[in-house]
Amino acid sequence: MLTAQLSRPSKSNTACRRGLIAACAMLTIAASTDTVLASSHREAPFITTVPKVDATDFYMFMSYETGRTDYVTLIANYLPLQAPYGGPNYFSLDPNALYEIHIDNNGDGKEELTFQFRFKNTLKSTALTIGDKSVPIPLIQSGVVNDPRAATLNLNETYTLDVVRGDRRSGTRASVTNATTGTATFDKPVDNIGRKTIADYPAYAAKHIYPINIPGCNLPGKVFVGQRKDPFAVNLGTIFDLVNAPVAVIADPALINAAPNTIDDKNVTTLALEIHKSCLVAGSETVIGGWTSASLRQARLVDPLPKSGHQTADKAGGAWVQVSRLGMPLVNEVVIGLPDKDKFNASKPKDDGQFLNYVTNPTLPALLSVVLNLPGAAPTNLPRNDLVTTFLTGIKGVNQPANVVPAEELRLNTAIAAVPFAQQNRLGIVGNILAKGNDNAGFPNGRRPKDDVVDVSLVAVMGGLCIANGDGNALGFGAACKPSAVPLGQTSLRLHDAVDQAVVPLLPNFPYLANPLGGTR
């Protein structure tokens, strides 16, 4: 059951004018097909040109691994749609980029903590003697790989991790270190090239899960950076072909897994942290907001005559410029209009009021009405304060900070205990409300890998919560959020994309996402 009476924030119209509603973004439909490929894969024009810094998904949840009570897991995925056979270079991250995970622990839309990842690729230039010549090999490996920094690796990828307190650029910075060795450099496993190169990839990857000491935190955490199977599930082809599916299918709960997951054969690169909640919260406030971003140097010079070596074809310099941003899933994907997608990726949560028109008057319900030939199916309770409450400020009594400033962040109440995987409702809080259950630990209270954010968002954006709210504002989503404002009626509670997130393979422990698919299987 909900832990408190749900109610929308006071002055919610003003709140709408100050922030971006993330959740109305999550309807998986779009009029343009050239920039969308999953939760946030290739979602903006510029980011399609720099896939190494393209954030695809962000997760933040209370760890449900046995023995990890009170720990928070943060996962940022980058570099989308990796083919398992994508050699010979595979998918290293960009040494000229800055990858960050931000935490807002007082609800002001600004980061108070930032975890910064920087990568370095070191080429060995392994060579073979051919006749009387020493000739470098064309591969990143020369034989079997079993351990970090194996002698057979021709390219070693390492990273450093810093924690910044305060502003991400001007705050106090300190190095996160390996709790076992005391070193500040970590090894990233090579991608899953195939079974002949790496016979037991799960065992090899597990050697790259490191215990860490975080300055200012009294309890050790964990870090893992490496390739994983893409955990997102969606029926892309059908959806972006103007939702080429009968309403009878996407409104039938018996058919929630009737369509193929079109990215089931793809990998991503994961940046994962597990940190005790006491190191993330501030004072008595138990709700934290989180998001990930990636930045590039402002200037890039391409060398017409690159020297021998690794990645010598360009030079980068100048200030960091943010080019990717992701908190709530699907926001830039399908809510922000095409002219503002690059602008959104460069923005910060505290400035989200500039995207007002995409929030209070969302286009997606109207688009769905058109492509499904259901005239007038969009909810009529404009402005959509039910969505503002649920996804922008957080739900009062669940994941709304006491002094919240509306902003597009994933919000998590660290005081709500994790629910074991088998008992998790795949529809998160929305499913919990509809089922009158006791799982308040799921999306949009954070996001777990099992949470079906596509289906949750379809229900919410098409008015399902207003059906549940009733004429008496039972759940506190606002008096205008009532059944008569929902043309689809009870059908809005049953919408889905015909791909079940709950059947995606996952691990029961950190880093939770499944091992990547190999180049040979």
Which residue ranges define each predicted feature?
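Sec-dependent N-terminal signal peptides
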Residues: 13-27
